Amino acid sequence: MKILLDQPLNGMKMYLESYGYEIVTAYEKKMTQAADDDLVKASIKEDSIFVTNDNKAAKLARMHGAKLIHIDMAFLAKVIHNELSK
C-alpha cells in the first residue's frame, strides 16, 4: 500500500515505514510548494492514499474521489490535551 504524505506530516514517514507501508512524501517528490490540486492528482495517478492535515486539500481530494486520510489537527490537539490533563 502506497501512501503520499502532505508536507506538514513528513515526520510520520519513519513510523509508518516501520509498519511496512511504502511512504512517499511531498518533500521527496519536490512538491512542497505544489498546489493541493497537484498533490491530489499525483496521489490518484500513483494509486496512493493521500494523507493530509489541510482541510482545503482534504475537501479537494474528496471531490476528486482520491483515497484519503484526513488528520483533523483540532481533534489531535484535544487528544494531546486530554492525555496531559490526566
Kindly label every feature range from the protein language model.
Residues 25-27:
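A local structural motif
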Residues 44-62:
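Acidic, metal-binding active-site segment of PIN/NYN-like and related structure-specific nucleases
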Residues 21, 32-33, 52-53:
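Short secondary-structure boundary micro-motifs
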Residues 1-19, 30-31, 37-40, 58-86:
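Acidic, PIN/NYN-like endoribonuclease modules and their adjacent C-terminal/linker elements
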